[in-house]
Curated annotation (Swiss-Prot):
Lineage: Bacteria, Pseudomonadati, Campylobacterota, Epsilonproteobacteria, Campylobacterales
Subunit structure as annotated in this protein's UniProt entry: Heterotetramer of two alpha and two beta chains.
EC number: 2.3.1.35, 2.3.1.1
Name of the protein described by the UniProt record: Arginine biosynthesis bifunctional protein ArgJ
Class of this enzyme: transferase
Family under the similarity heading: Belongs to the ArgJ family.
Amino acid sequence: MFEIIPIKGGVNAPQGFYADGVSAGLKPPLPNGAPALDVAFLYSEDVLKPFTLFTSNRFQAAPITHFKHFIKGKESNFVLINTKNANAMTGERGVQDVCDILSSLTQKFPFIQNPIMSSTGVIGQYLPKEKIIASFASFDFNAKCENAHTRAADAIRTTDAFSKEIALRVRLDNGESFCIGAMAKGAGMIQPALATMLCFITTDALVPQNEGDRILRECAKTSFNAISVDGDMSTNDSVFLFANGRSGVYNEAAFKEALKMIMHKLATDMVRDGEGSTKLVAFEVCGARDESQAICAAKALTNSLLVKTAIYGEDPNWGRIASTIGASGVECNEESLRIAFDSVVVFDRGQICFDEENEARAAAVMEQESFRITCDLGIGEGHFVAYGCDLGYRYIDINADYRS
């Protein structure tokens, strides 16, 4: 058995890691005139091989290409993150820009080994190399400021309304413990198959090198690969897990449960922070022929514009839900389908349960900031939960002006 305890510190909570955020002038100043944080770093006192997940978009951004060609399989102790510019669709020049920036970094700080770069922002623009390189003068690895992790989480934001970070301590029955910390960004271009996001996870658990990638993939299946804001897949999606083993402690079940909690929290925060969203909705599909069909139906619901706009209008239009399931290609029929808003059943095995009272109850459910729509296909044992949000006017406002 084990106990999982929330703690402070974000990615800096585990032993041997330090992250901070600085301003490179990539973002405009804040309303009060102060410079906005737009470059972050994550430094590990130990060199290690990170466990990774990347976007399945065929047009992968230059930082991902650089990692796969120059860093993969090597030990690293540093990640440099910039916002405002994705360095995607920039070809060979984009990769060379990454090489130039990281070369300047290692010249200034010789203790940095095989640094990794991660970018997020507008696609199709070249990096402002000089500004990013100039920001290195603000890097302080000795300050160990208590709020540095918060600055780092703030610096990686793009259209995010709030920073996303979390830290947990896992205590085993024998009294031994380890920590996991994380920070992430993501609010738009969120689509299953990672989502448009960056996530950096640190731990002092002694994770075996041959287990980390598998566990990361398994935890992503029900978190980052189970969310959607707008159905668009980014070129830059990346998840990094750094494990230095300093605690000397590891228990697979405990580690996996804590990592799953962290990734689920960050993933649902992304949906909750979806550009212009006001609702977080869990779309639970059960009774499908198998898990793959449950996944297909659940993700179809998260991406349906008609379903999303009905949620925004707090309209329990269950017909849109049924139609989306029917169009998803999964095995289903009216006689076995059951649809409920939380505990309010509106359609049950071919019977419409949508009288005036039930409609009012379902509408009341939809007034909440977070609720569940359950669709039981009544065919098999397949089950999956995907997370989505509504779609309102604010999403259009944000994305119509995104480059400005």
